[in-house]
From Swiss-Prot:
Its EC number is 2.3.1.31. Residues 34-346 form the AB hydrolase-1 domain. GO terms for molecular function: homoserine O-acetyltransferase activity. It is found in: Cytoplasm. Its main location: cytoplasm. It comes from the Archaea. The active site is at S137, D306, H340. Transfers an acetyl group from acetyl-CoA to L-homoserine, forming acetyl-L-homoserine. This is Homoserine O-acetyltransferase. It comes from Halobacterium salinarum (strain ATCC 700922 / JCM 11081 / NRC-1). It catalyses: L-homoserine + acetyl-CoA = O-acetyl-L-homoserine + CoA.
Amino acid sequence: MPTTELDGFTFACGDTVDSLTVAYRTYGDYTGSNAVLVCHALTGSQHVRGRADGDDRGWWPDIVGPGRPIDTTEYFVVCANVPGSCHGTDGPPADGPGGDPWGTAFPPVTVPDWTRCQRRLLDTLGVDRLHAVVGGSVGGMNALDWARRYPDDVHRIAAVATAPRLDAQCLGLNAIARRAIRGDPNWNDGDYYGGAHPDRGLALARQLGHVMYLSKASMADKFGRRTATTDTALPADPAAEFFATRDVESYLDYQADTFVARFDANSYLYLLRAMDAYDLAAGRPSVADALAAFDGDALVLSFTGDWHFTAAQSATVADAFRAGGAAGVAHHVVDSDYGHDAFLVDSAAVGPPLADFLAAGTDGAAVTDATGGV
C-alpha cells in the first residue's frame, strides 16, 4: 500500500506533528492535465477501485476503473485516506512518537486539514492543477473545500450528495452516535488499545448511521415488517427472546458486526467531529463568497430520496456557485429511492452525468440542471 510522509504537518487546531503518514492509491497514468482527485466518505478508504491484492472491490468500483465513468485509461485518479481515519493514514490508532497508539492525544482533525493534506500529497506526486475533484457525502464537503481553498488548482468540482454544512437533525443524530461510543465502558476515555475495544458502542453508532443512509421507501421495500431468524444480536439484547426479530434488525446486526471488525471507534469519533464542525462559509459572509474565487465548472449531484443531504440543500450549493461566478454550474437531481447511499449503489444514474461532466463540463450530454425545479 503506497504511503508518503508529510514533514511538519500543522493541523487547524494549531498542533504540529513532525511527520504525518498518508496512505493513498493512484490509478492510471499522469499526462500533466488529467488528474482527478476522489474524496472518500466518512468511513471510506483510499481503495476506491479495490485493493492492489484484489482482496475487495473497493467502495466505488462501478464508477472508477477502466471503461468506467471515471475512466482510469483516460484519467490519473488519486484517492487518499484522510487524517484521523484508520486505513493507513495517521489517526488515533496509529503509533505516536512514543511508539504507543495516539488515542485521543492525536490532534483533532477538520475537513480543511484533509484538503491541505491532499494538496501536499499531490505536490509529492508532481500534480499541480487538477482536472477535477470528485467527492460524495462528507467527501463532497471535502471537494467543496477545494473550491474555496485552492480555487486555482482545480478545473472542475463534482460535489455529490452533500451540503455546505450539517443541519440540526444530522448534528443531533451524530451526537447520539458519539454518545453510544463514549458510553461503552470499554472506551476508557479513548485509551483501549491494550485491551477490549468499545465494540458495543461502535456497533450502535454504525447501526444508527445505516438508518440515516437509507430512505423510508428503500427500507420498506428491502425489509418491510418481515421477521428473521438470528442466533445473535450485536449488541446483545437480553429481551430478544420475548420479541420477534425483524429483517431490518438482522441487516443492522450484520452491518455492525462487519464494521467493528474493520474500523476504529476513536477514528469514528474524530471523523464525525470533522463533519459536524465543517461550514463552507466559515469566516465568510456567505457560501457564495466562500466560492467566489473558483471560476471553473461545478456539478452538484443530489438524490430525491436522500434525507441526510437533501436536494434542496444541494440547490443552495449550486446557487452559491452561480452567485460566486463559476463558469458553468449544474444541479443534477437523480430520482432515486435508495436514500443517501444512492451515490454509492445507483451507478447507472450517477455514472453518465459524472462521466459527461468530466469530459465536457456542464455542457455534457447527460448533465441536466434542475434550477428552479427543486
